[in-house]
Amino acid sequence: MLRARFSTSRSVLTKVVTPPPVVPPVLPPPVKPPKKSFSLPKFLFSATLIGSLAYGGTLYVATKNEKVMDYVIDYQPPFYEEILRMIETGSIDEIRDAWDSLRDRISNVDFSSSKSKIDKFANDLENRGEQLIQKTRQRWGQDTAPTPHEQLQKPVETTQKSPESLPLLSYKGINESVHATVASFNELIKSIDISGPGSNDLVKAIQDNVAKLSQKVDALTASFDDELKKNLKVSQNELLSSYTKKELELTENLLHQYNTERAQLEKKLNARLEQEIASAKEAISQAAVNAVTMVRIEQTKNFEKLVKDKVDGERSGRLANLDKLSSRLDELEQFAESLEQQIVANHNRSTINRSLAELRSLISSTEGTTPKSLAPYLGQLIEAVRPINDELIDATLKEIVPLLQHESSHSILSTSQLLARWELLSPELRSASLLPPNAGLLGHFTSFVFSKLLLPVKGAKPNGKDIESVIGRVEANLVRNELDLAVEEAASLKGWPRKLADDWVVEARKRLEAEFLLGLIEGEVRSL
């Protein structure tokens, strides 16, 4: 069809240029108009459109059906990953932007051709046609008819004819997205001058194809919008369910965290409450002592105020006795101060005596009681004697703290325990007293045998220096609770008996020193 247009245009131009013919050319017999030829562009456009729709529909179905998706993955058609990604994650705005970009590209295509290009293309077609006709005539022996070149050499009659143009396409009933394409076709039609019987049919066919294209675009857009709405609705439901599930999970996590934090806060609050209760008890006990002191001080102040008011009330009538009242008031003030000092001293003394009594009771405790450390009670004693500021008491505390700081109520032996250990130690002392100097195994054996033959002495011999007299005096002193004399007798031993009694002497001295130092503090406190 396009070749016919160019041939007709070329023939018209030829008629305008060539001179008038001398001999009229021999015209070929009339030929019947050919039937409507096959349109390759229309076929390609339809096939491309149908193939694209089928390909896109197959990939869209693959997103919904696993079997189709397996088929697509097995055969791997071209660009299937990109199209699937666009179907799953694309949006209407992206499709519209792509369509607008494609439409702009089509509208920017330059379909207009210059007249020189058309003439050149027509000359090429004419030359190829002449060559084809010559070859055909040579083959079939038909050389009688003049060739187109011969016809051109003959003068022809010159006629003036204005070029006709094809009718333009109409925009009526066409989708707006195809307007740019229609405009491009109209520009192409304007650039072509043609006169022939099939021009109107050609324009009508193009108009029908454009209308069908517009209808298909509308149908495709409507189906795409419907499918998009369905997908959006399904996605909305899925998102709503997922958000609801996440909300429930977050609520459970928050409740669990809340319960955990609540339990921890309750635990901390209970511990803090117990600590505050203990502090409050201690503060209340201290406040009770302070309250007694404050009441006495307040009574003294009230008495002073009463006296002052009495003096001020009777000053005008009894000025002669004012000096006596002033001296009496000074005496009362001194008495109040001395009374306050005595009260404080009595309180400190009672606190010190209580601490000393607790230490004595712990030192004298029996084995059946629970062992207790003496360090806290020593701390209470130090705090109690600190306000006194006495040098003797401070020196005594420096001696007693290293002695009893690491001891407990069971580590310091009582008098009965010392007596029991002395009785257990007595046989060994008797045996050791019979050992000669540098005794060997035989000496130890004989001393053990002869020690069994010794008869224990009943009663104490004040002047006896033998081992039996010493053992008897120690036992008698322990029975009379005279620990200092017992330690002195045990320390007077010599040789192996003194070595054997060394541990007993250390334990006895520890108790003796503790009792002596506590008694010294108690006596000093009483003398204050």
UniProtKB/Swiss-Prot annotation:
Biased composition (Polar residues): 136-145
Positions in the Mitochondrial intermembrane compartment: 63-528
Coiled coil start-end: 199-349
Domain of life according to the entry: Eukaryota
Membrane topology annotation: Single-pass membrane protein
GO cellular component: MICOS complex
Keyword Transferase: no
Region of interest (Disordered), ranges: 136-164
Membrane-spanning parts: 43-62
GO biological process: cristae formation
Keyword annotations: Coiled coil, Membrane, Mitochondrion, Mitochondrion inner membrane, Transit peptide, Transmembrane, Transmembrane helix
Pfam families linked: Mitofilin
Compartmental location: Mitochondrion inner membrane
Subunit structure: Component of the mitochondrial contact site and cristae organizing system (MICOS) complex.
Function according to Swiss-Prot or TrEMBL: Component of the MICOS complex, a large protein complex of the mitochondrial inner membrane that plays crucial roles in the maintenance of crista junctions, inner membrane architecture, and formation of contact sites to the outer membrane. Plays a role in keeping cristae membranes connected to the inner boundary membrane. Also promotes protein import via the mitochondrial intermembrane space assembly (MIA) pathway.
Family statement: Belongs to the MICOS complex subunit Mic60 family.
UniProt protein name: MICOS complex subunit MIC60
Gene: MIC60
